[in-house]
């Protein structure tokens, strides 16, 4: 919660931490920024590493304690090859890596007990491997299970780690169906703060096929999750949401060499976005921060494929020559509104910041990039 100066009840703010493998260390910086702003979430929700750190926060761990643990975090603390399984069971082995290191990490960060034992409500997403349906641990009927078991299951990336047993369910990584669980967290709160470190964008890359199984798998998974997530965000209504997207696309999913950088990026991105917190809290819905941009189309490059119109018919249309044009050249963009620009197959669409004063100049040089990233 965030205290109001006027003495009125503080708004109930839910915090959502998305999945993103080791990029999720940026969540630690985000939590630090929230602590400094004296924002205490009324509810936590998370997927994968976001679930682990959300559970740690709900267990009472501070960002400083998380930072200290992250600095000691080594590759062998997470990845130990399942040699026996790979040799003896071959294709029937459940995973490349052993369960025990990930399980030990979950046990270290998350308090013992069930969801009813936590000081703050927590929602952890996973997927039931047998029926293919998403599961939200912490919801009524799914609270009497060990939080550590739910967190492990939410982090159990298929093929990398064995599925986790939670109660009588066999579960895998929640990011398989919902990498940023804003929909499940948006109930019974007045506003949301969502930290998306995983799949805000899938930047163009070359040579992927030669970089091995893990790189190919994670890129394919990122494409799938990006499209699922973008649909949810483009259709978002209520409650109002502050969407923070730290710029971490240049860092690989499993890099141990950028821990401090990730924490710093998460901190700075969240601190910057929090300048719009009061505006977001005063709104009835929508996604923030919002910035004015000009949408410009290169008519020579435009092929008239209509993809931009299909994605954003409220913003784009085709003229009598079959070329795309903006219905409103000046638009009010949130971090979730740039997908139709990036999806243009010939890069004919640009969204340029409206430069009007010092504030928008600053946005153009830094914040604007984060808004449409």
Show which residues each predicted segment covers:
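Residues immediately within or flanking Cys/His clusters that coordinate Zn2+
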Residues: 299-305, 334, 338-341
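Iron-sulfur cluster-binding cysteine motifs and their immediate structural context
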Residues: 307-321, 339-356
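Extended beta-strand/beta-hairpin segments
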Residues: 319-323, 367-370
């Amino acid at each position: 919660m965030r205290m109001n100066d006027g003495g009125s009840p503080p708004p109930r703010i839910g915090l959502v931490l998305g999945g993103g493998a080791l990029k999720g260390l940026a969540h630690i910086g985000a939590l630090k920024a929230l602590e400094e702003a004296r924002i205490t979430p009324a509810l936590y929700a998370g997927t994968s590493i976001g679930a682990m750190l959300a559970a740690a926060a709900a267990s009472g761990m501070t960002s400083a304690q998380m930072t200290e643990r992250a600095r000691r975090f080594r590759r062998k603390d997470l990845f130990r090859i399942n040699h026996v399984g790979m040799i003896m069971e071959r294709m029937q082995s459940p995973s490349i890596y052993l369960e025990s290191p990930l399980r030990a990490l979950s046990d270290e960060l998350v308090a013992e007990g069930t969801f009813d034992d936590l000081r703050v409500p927590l929602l952890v997403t996973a997927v039931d491997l047998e029926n293919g349906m998403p599961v939200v641990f912490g919801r009524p009927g799914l609270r009497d299970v060990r939080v550590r078991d739910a967190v492990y299951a939410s982090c159990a990336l298929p093929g990398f780690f064995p599925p986790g047993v939670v109660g009588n369910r066999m579960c895998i990584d929640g990011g398989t169906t919902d990498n940023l669980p804003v929909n499940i967290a948006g109930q019974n709160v007045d506003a949301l703060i969502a930290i998306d470190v995983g799949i805000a964008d899938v930047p163009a890359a070359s040579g992927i096929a030669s970089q091995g199984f893990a790189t190919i798998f994670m890129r394919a998974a990122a494409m799938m999750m990006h499209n699922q997530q973008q649909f949810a965000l483009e259709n978002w209504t209520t409650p109002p949401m502050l969407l923070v997207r730290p710029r971490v696309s240049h860092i690989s999913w499993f890099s141990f060499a950028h821990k401090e950088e990730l924490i710093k990026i998460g901190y700075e991105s969240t601190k910057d976005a929090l300048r719009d917190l009061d505006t977001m809290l005063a709104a009835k819905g929508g996604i923030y921060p919002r910035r004015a941009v000009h949408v410009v189309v290169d008519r020579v490059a435009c092929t008239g494929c209509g993809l931009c119109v299909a994605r954003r018919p409220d913003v784009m249309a085709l003229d009598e020559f079959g070329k795309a044009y903006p219905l409103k050249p000046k638009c009010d963009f949130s971090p979730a509104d740039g997908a139709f620009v990036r999806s243009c197959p010939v890069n004919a669409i640009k969204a340029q910041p409206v430069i009007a004063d010092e504030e928008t100049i600053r946005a153009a040089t830094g914040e604007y990039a984060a808004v449409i990233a």
